[in-house]
Amino acid sequence: MLSKTFLLSSAVLWARVANAAFGITDNGSSYTIDANSPNPLKFTVNKSSCDITSIVYYGSEFQYSGKGSHIGSGLGSATVSATQSGDYIKVTCDTSSLTHYFVVHNGDPIIHMATYITAEPDIGELRFIARLNSNLLPNEEPFGDVSTTSGGSAIEGSDVFLVNGETRSKFYSSERFIDDHRHCISGSAHRVCMILNQYESSSGGPFFRDINSNNGGDYNALYWYMNSGHVQTESFRTGLHGPYSMYFSRSGTPSTNIDTSFFASLGIKGYVAANGRGTVTGKASGADSSMDWVVHWYNNDAQYWTYTASDGSFTSPAMKPGTYTMKYYQGEFPVAETTVTVSAGSSTTKNISGSVKTGTTIFKIGEWDGQPTGFRNADKQLRMHPSDSRMDSWSSTYTVGSSSLSDFPMAVFKSVNNPVTIKFTATSAQTGAATLRIGTTLSFAGGRPQATINSYTGPAPSAPTNLNSRGVTRGAYRGLGEVYDVSVPAGTIVTGENTITISVISGSSGDAFLSPNVVFDCIELFQ
């Protein structure tokens, strides 16, 4: 005889299967979309605001009840319609300058999305935020609780918190665009992932990073930031952002290889199908082979990138037609730049070559990789505030030949560890004229380096471009990458021991880690 437990569980499963029917239900003030997926997914979209107000997956309500999931902080009002065509459902939300789409394919537990804009939203950023049940989905992936701020007290602005003695922020969930194909939140029985295969209308390039998730207690937020003012290095792009996909699963992590080519038949504004695109193939050469090589294409309308193969060969993603700047990086440091024109339906061949050129090196601290790799606290800075007790001391003296790379701080702050001191020993052959090259990756509050070599003080550089954004305290190190050359007159360097100090200067001031600062890439003295 079958047990009551078995009969009950079978009845629940049967109910889930029986209720599954791909389609749209018009509730008067909202639409409910049934994906007809094996693990049932239904979600409800408000007709007047475009907010998602309910997401029921495998019988559990995932949507936070206090506020919806939506573009920006909500569209406020929109014209919302829903249509079904065969195995596809499209919900369209229209405003005067933005159209947002939810798309569902019959049988898939995925909410595909795309966002078309003709102007940047007034709030100065474009994002989708899913506010999900933090009891069912408390975890953040792949970086864990570094961005879980629930129960914390604010220590900087309203976005950096102290939680159980650790600094945390939603910004510490970030990953470089070139590496961020998927980020997730999860619980013991469920996982929801944002799958990102298209950044062409975003801004900032391959090394830009932004908020991915944040468990703030009331809900766990899963984001896709298409653009923002968070250390933004270029103008915003309009047009179609996406497709991007919110994937629901019970176990395992979904693949990032999702085919969204069906968007071509759905009347999505701004969508360019594969046959309307072209590619660039070629070979990169000349850069430091110990580093990853990246090729990057961009213009006012789109951006693309790819890692090269080990031999330097590459093929671009499928690109919209146009003329692009083509840039070549070792790590994140640019070594060459050219232009290339892409035509629909064809592949263009374009090689690129470049390297870092200096001179006869007296000493070099770090590598020209466009990152603070290996410097003190660089291994921690992405995931915690510089004031965190787990950080090493920011002050130190670096002695060439005996200090470890990790003895050199990744950043100099005007009110914390200013100046940074370097000691080195020179031979008589090294006392002639020289160049001290100071590579930086990011500046804050007008900070720029001024060097003193023994008794000679180099000129004060002009202020760099102001990105108007906190950086290093929010887990960023990538800005415009200014490089400063200091001409050192002959006789300044002496035989024997020499001392260099690098001070951050600025007409601005600030407390502690919000004082003017620069992040270092590499320091090289050469003749």
UniProtKB/Swiss-Prot annotation:
User: Which molecular-function annotations from GO does this UniProt entry contain?
Assistant: carbohydrate binding; carbon-oxygen lyase activity, acting on polysaccharides; rhamnogalacturonan endolyase activity
EC number annotated for this UniProt entry? 4.2.2.23
Chemical reaction(s) catalysed: Endotype eliminative cleavage of L-alpha-rhamnopyranosyl-(1->4)-alpha-D-galactopyranosyluronic acid bonds of rhamnogalacturonan I domains in ramified hairy regions of pectin leaving L-rhamnopyranose at the reducing end and 4-deoxy-4,5-unsaturated D-galactopyranosyluronic acid at the non-reducing end
Q: Which cysteines does the record link by disulfide bonds?
A: C50-C93, C184-C193
Q: Which residues are glycosylated according to the annotation?
A: N27, N46, N351
GO terms of biological process kind: cell wall organization; pectin catabolic process
Q: Where in the cell is it found?
A: Secreted
InterPro entries given for it?
Answer: Carb-bd-like_fold, Gal_mutarotase_sf_dom, Galactose-bd-like_sf, GH-type_carb-bd, RG-lyase_II, RG-lyase_III, Rhamnogalacturonase_B, RhgB_N
PANTHER family, sorted: RHAMNOGALACTURONATE LYASE-RELATED (PTHR36574:SF1)
Q: Which family does it belong to?
A: Belongs to the polysaccharide lyase 4 family.
The record describes the protein's role as: Pectinolytic enzymes consist of four classes of enzymes: pectin lyase, polygalacturonase, pectin methylesterase and rhamnogalacturonase. Degrades the rhamnogalacturonan I (RG-I) backbone of pectin. Active against linseed rhamnogalacturonan.
What this protein is called in its record is Rhamnogalacturonate lyase A
Source organism (scientific name):
Emericella nidulans (strain FGSC A4 / ATCC 38163 / CBS 112.46 / NRRL 194 / M139) (Aspergillus nidulans)
